[in-house]
Amino acid sequence: MATADEHLGYPYRASGEARTRARPETVWRVVSSIGGENRYFTLNALWTVREAMDALIGGEGLVRRRPEGGTLRPGDRIDSWTVLVADAPRRLALLFGMKAPGRGVLEFVIAREGDTTVVSATAYWRPKGLAGVLYWRAMEPAHLFLFRMLTREICRRAERLEAEWAAARVRAAQPASGPGPRLSLAARRLP
């Protein structure tokens, strides 16, 4: 098993980031729900192709799983990934579990900057030989595109979640019988 921060020294990385007005705790809720039946939020066809390739060579790429309960812990398995770091609401690092010529980690970092929250997704890669370097070079453009799309979608989902919560609070604050009829001044009877 890799150590929690070992990947920070890996020589190759690709990342994307996005900003949202959603709170870090809400962004974490979205990020930490990744995998399993939830899939990967965007461009799932690309993830599925890579998973199928892994399955063809005997890997666990097509396995769908998430830990029971809502709290992630180091060692938990999410599909073929292993949780290295689960530091709510700031950081989630996942060890790449598919067959590949090297070792990889996907890390999400959530940080508050002023009145916005920044979420980044970064792939770290330590190649094993020339095959690992070539693998990275082939995958890097897709990673750059994918992580920009992924972080934007995470932000969109977090904003939608907060909007749904706000709407539920408004509904809960209304009287049980609902608001009465609203009449314009012209429709009211004047004495």
In which residue ranges do the predicted regions lie?
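Glycine-rich portal/gate segments that line the openings of hydrophobic small-molecule binding cavities
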Residues: 24-25, 32-99, 153, 165-168
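A short, structured loop/turn motif at beta-sheet edges
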Residues: 21-25, 85-89, 109-118
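Glycine-rich, low-complexity intrinsically disordered segments
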Residues: 72, 91, 104-107, 140, ...
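Short coil/turn motifs at beta-sheet boundaries
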Residues: 9-11, 76, 101, 114
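Hydrophobic ligand-binding cavity/cleft-lining segments
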Residues: 1-63, 173-191
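Beta-strand/loop substructures that line and gate deep hydrophobic ligand-binding cavities in soluble
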Residues: 98-144
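A conserved amphipathic terminal alpha-helix motif
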Residues: 127, 131-171, 176-182
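Short, surface-exposed coil-to-beta transition loops
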Residues: 13-15, 78, 102-107
